[in-house]
Amino acid sequence: METFLFTSESVNEGHPDKLCDQISDAVLDACLAQDPESKVACETCTKTNMVMVFGEITTKAQVDYEKIVRDTCRAIGFVSDDVGLDADNCKVLVNIEQQSPDIAQGVHGHLTKRPEEIGAGDQGHMFGYATDETPELMPLSHVLATKLGARLTEVRKNGTCPWLRPDGKTQVTVEYYNDNGAMVPIRVHTVLISTQHDETVTNDEIAADLKEHVIKPVVPEKYLDEKTIFHLNPSGRFVIGGPHGDAGLTGRKIIIDTYGGWGAHGGGAFSGKDPTKVDRSGAYIVRQAAKSIVASGLARRCIVQVSYAIGVPEPLSVFVDTYGTGKIPDKEILKIVKENFDFRPGMIAINLDLKRGGNSRFLKTAAYGHFGREDPDFTWEVVKPLKFEKVEA
C-alpha cells in the first residue's frame, strides 16, 4: 500500500496574529449587535505594549474600540508584560474611517438595494472543501492540529498546567492512503507542539504534561504507535511570547482558519469583515456546498470554487471537483450545487444569518478554525438537504 505524509499546523488564541483576528472580529460583533447593516473592514496590528485598530467602518452602533481591545486581550490571558502584553496598560491606537462612498454606491447603493441586488464588496475567488475522513468532514491533519491548540488553552485556563502562557503553536503530520481520490488516514506520523511557558518549569515537565494532558485527550489512540514522533518545545525555551515575541496582524493565518493546506485558497482573509465582503461570506457558502455534497453521499471528497466582481450580485463562475470520488459526473454535481445554493452576497447573508453579531458570534470563529465546528452560530456548517432528481443507476 502506497502512502504519503501531509502536514497541517495551527496556532492558539494567544498567538499575536490570532490576537489580531480576534480583536477585529470582536469589533465586527459589537457593530453588528447594534446595527446589522454595519459595513465593517477592521484590521488590527500589535507589537510590544501596543495594539492598533484601523480600517473602514460605517455603522450606527456606538462602539468603544479601546474597551473591546482591552477586553479581548484580557480574556485571552494577556494580563501582564511577563506574558507578552498587559491588557490594562498597553497603548491602544484607533484609526477608523467610513467606508469609501465609491464602494458603498456600487455594492449596496448606500443601503438602498434589496438583498438580492446587493453586489459583491470586492472581486475575488473563494474555495470550500469537504472530505469524509472525519465526522466533521474536515481533513484529519487540520482537525488534530486545531484541537491540540484549543486543548492547550483549555488546560492553561482551567489550571491543569499552570506553567502555560497564552502563545503557542501546533503541527500534525498524518500518514495517508489515497483510495481512488478519497483520503484515508492511517496513522499520526509526527506531533509538534511549541508552547509559551513561565520560568518555573523544566523541559522534561513540559514534555510530560503535554503528552498526558494535551496529546492523550485529543489524538485518538488508534492513530498513535511506537513510531510516532513527538517534538515538544524543540527550541528548548519559549518564555517570551505574544506581541512581545512577534508582531501580529489580522489575516495572517488564513490556512489555519480554513483547511490546513488541503483544498485550495483564494487568498482572502475572514476576520473583521461584514457579510458584504465575499472573502468571508463566499467562503462560508462554498464550505456549506462542499460539505452538503459529501454528507449527501454524492462524493467522498469535494472542492467548490466561486468568484465575484465588485458591485455584481451573481457569481462570475462556480466550479466543482470531486477528485474522482463522485457517484455521478462532476458536471451533474455542479448543476445540483447551482440549483441548491444562492451565491448572491445579499442572499448568503440572509440564508446563513450573517448579519447577526454580538454574543462573541464572530469572535468564536477567530481562533481554532471557521469550519468543522459544532456550534449553532456556525450556520454554514449545517448540512443542507439537496433537492435533485435521482438518476437511476
Curated annotation (Swiss-Prot):
Binds 2 divalent ions per subunit. The metal ions interact primarily with the substrate. Can utilize magnesium, manganese or cobalt (in vitro). Binds 1 potassium ion per subunit. The potassium ion interacts primarily with the substrate. Potassium can be replaced by NH(4) (in vitro). GO terms for biological process: one-carbon metabolic process; S-adenosylmethionine biosynthetic process. GO terms for molecular function: ATP binding; metal ion binding; methionine adenosyltransferase activity. Optimum pH is 7-8.3. K(+) binds at E43. GO terms for cellular component: cytoplasm. It catalyses: L-methionine + ATP + H2O = S-adenosyl-L-methionine + phosphate + diphosphate. Optimum temperature is 37-45 degrees Celsius. L-methionine binds at E56, Q99, D246, K277. This is S-adenosylmethionine synthase 2. It comes from Catharanthus roseus (Madagascar periwinkle). The gene is SAMS2.
